[in-house]
Amino acid sequence: MSGKIIDKVKVFMGFDVFEDEEVEEEETVEIEDELVPVMNSKRNKVVNIHTTTQMKVVLYEPTNFEEAPNIVDNLKNRKPVIINLENIEPDLAKKFFDFLNGAIYALDGNIQKVSSGIFILAPNNVDISGNIKEELKNKGVFPWQK
């Protein structure tokens, strides 16, 4: 028993000799990566600004309300429409205007009054800038007219 107490005191004081324990070391292996040159395969993406498609403007002078869906179909196909409502009854003209104004709103388009019964209806891909009525009043319909 006395041997155990002495061993404990030696361990406590740090005088006890331990057998060297073998510590397993992890082997580090260096792997050389082969550098392979990568070819830059990016190609320049060139987009032609000038497109060959021409925008068509559709003119309508309706005589009855059955033509209204055809006008809206042109707007859905992203074609601007000029509509002349001067030669139809005022009630029918109001009905046309209300229907087309709702279609323009639904298609996120634009409507501009040219004269008392003539309107330009443009889909969302066509911008109408300025006040056309004022420009027509100042410049005339054709540039050479004043």
From Swiss-Prot:
Xref: Pfam families:
SepF
Keyword vocabulary terms for this entry: Cell cycle, Cell division, Cytoplasm, Septation
Matches recorded under InterPro entries: Cell_div_SepF, Cell_div_SepF/SepF-rel, SepF-like_sf
Is the keyword Transmembrane helix in the record?
no
Provide a GO CC annotation, any one: cytoplasm
Localization, per the record, is: Cytoplasm
- Its primary localisation, in coarse terms, equals cytoplasm
One GO biological process term is:
division septum assembly
Q: What does this protein do?
A: Cell division protein that is part of the divisome complex and is recruited early to the Z-ring. Probably stimulates Z-ring formation, perhaps through the cross-linking of FtsZ protofilaments. Its function overlaps with FtsA.
UniProt record similarity statement? Belongs to the SepF family.
Q: Which HAMAP family match?
A: SepF
Record's subunit section? Homodimer. Interacts with FtsZ.
Q: What is this protein called?
A: Cell division protein SepF
Organism the protein comes from: Alkaliphilus oremlandii (strain OhILAs) (Clostridium oremlandii (strain OhILAs))
Encoding gene, per UniProt annotation:
sepF
